[in-house]
Curated annotation (Swiss-Prot):
Chain residues that bind a purine D-ribonucleoside: 8-9
Active site: 9 (proton donor)
Protein family: Belongs to the PNP/UDP phosphorylase family.
Origin: domain of life: Bacteria
Protein name as catalogued: Purine nucleoside phosphorylase DeoD-type
Function: Catalyzes the reversible phosphorolytic breakdown of the N-glycosidic bond in the beta-(deoxy)ribonucleoside molecules, with the formation of the corresponding free purine bases and pentose-1-phosphate.
Amino acid sequence: ALTLLTVSDSLITKESLSSLERQTTFNTMVKLALEMACELQK
């Protein structure tokens, strides 16, 4: 089993991503996850 997590808001430092940053980084995470899943299927 493999888990890939992305954090957009920190409860400790109160930092958060803008909507655009969240969209961009989540898209990157999804692409990476799909690439990894394809590699694991080989």
